[in-house]
Amino acid sequence: MRKFEPGNVHSTPGVNAKLKDAGFMRFMIVSLNRHINGDWGSMCDEDKAANEEALVDGLRLMSVYKRKDHPDDTIWIITEADRSATTILLPSEY
């Protein structure tokens, strides 16, 4: 069940370059759904709790996901405080 609306979803050039890999595309879609449903991925417990507070307080949300079959593939998903936009990016693009 969705915890929030993500607004316009964007991806960065680094993520777009990896979308040629169908497995990466599936990973990205599953990760986005997890983010919207409040599964914050590989965040520490403190950061997960901060996201739960951010849902109530209207602050920015961030999740981290690591691809199981390709551990070097990690994406960050950030939703703006006003929920107008969500960006999927590689950590190196932050």
Describe every region a protein language model picked out:
Residues 56-94:
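Short, compact, well-ordered microdomains
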